[in-house]
Amino acid sequence: MKAIQAALALGVALCATPLIVRAQADAPPAWAYPVNPPDFKLSPDDGTPRHVPDSTAAFTLTQARDLFFALDWHPSDHPPLPEIVAHGRKPDVMACGVCHRADGPRGPENASIAGLPAQYIVQQMADFKSGARTTSVPQRIPPQLMIKTAKGITDAEIEQAAAYFSGLKPRAVIKVVETATVPKTRVAGWFLAALPGGETEPIAGRIMEVPEDLERFELRDARSHFVAYVPPGSIEQGRQLASNGGNGKSAPCTICHGPELNGVGPIPGLAGRSPSYLVRQLYDFQHGTRAGPWSPLMAPDVINLTLDDMVALAAYAASLPP
């Protein structure tokens, strides 16, 4: 509790200065906000039951794409799913476990919510519902679905989902690799996937986060793993920023998010989470599209960050055990 009070006190002090949100002059980085091309089409379902390693379950592609049916390949990995997580409520409240997976590990296109504080999850749903939390790239479908769901879901359903996901232990599913060259990629459904053939290109200051096994990820296997390619030196640069704020550029992340970035009380942990997602959140905070009640605590800390800073912070956080 003392740590939380200290974090809040720091936030109040920081917020005593005028909050200036950066104008949208610098376009959102396309690699962090992948948008499906106009001709994007899902492969047709031939009705064949699909399988993933270490599971006796079988599902078709149609089932994998059903927004009201959370595929549960590994039911022994977690407690029983609440109805709102497993099936949602038609027509407007999709199953939480579809995008976030049955036990919350997510994909690069959305948030990992396993182990997040219940209070934080409840507040984010309120922010999506009120319009306080949007996105810097409105054409992206994942945040559109969150906003639609938040407007239709009941408080009781939110509490059920928040209690379930907050009680789960997050798992390490990301391998962070510093490299000067990365696989060439394509947008494969609001996320990036490596092109077949092994062609590479310069990383050029980006984070390129891709599934290790594309088919498993598209089948919503919660045990899917990812590789996040980050620029050389970015993890150490991020560690310095997180621990000392870059000599006045920002407040140290560790004050509010904890010494290992695992969170403090209602403040979410960042360790082991998708670096692509983290960059989007930093950018959205900086540009005012994420503006809930706790956002004023973040605004002074992100206003002076460059995109390279965001990449470094996200790379460092993702490299830590959740």
State the predicted function of each range.
Residues M1-Q5:
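Positively charged n-region of N-terminal signal peptides that target proteins for export
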Residues G107-I113, G265-A271:
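Short cysteine/histidine-rich zinc-coordinating motifs and their immediately flanking basic loops
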Residues I113, P117, A150-G152:
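Catalytic nucleophile-loop/oxyanion-hole region of alpha/beta-hydrolase
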Residues Q24-M94, R133-P252, H287-P322:
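Flexible coil segments in periplasmic/lumen-exposed cytochrome c-class electron-transfer proteins
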Residues L116-K129, S274-F285:
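Short microdomains enriched in Cys/His and/or Lys/Arg
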Residues A102, P259:
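Cys/His-rich metal-chelating microdomains
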Residues A7-P18:
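Bacterial N-terminal signal peptides
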Residues V98, I255:
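Short, cysteine/histidine-rich loop/knuckle motifs that typically chelate Zn2+
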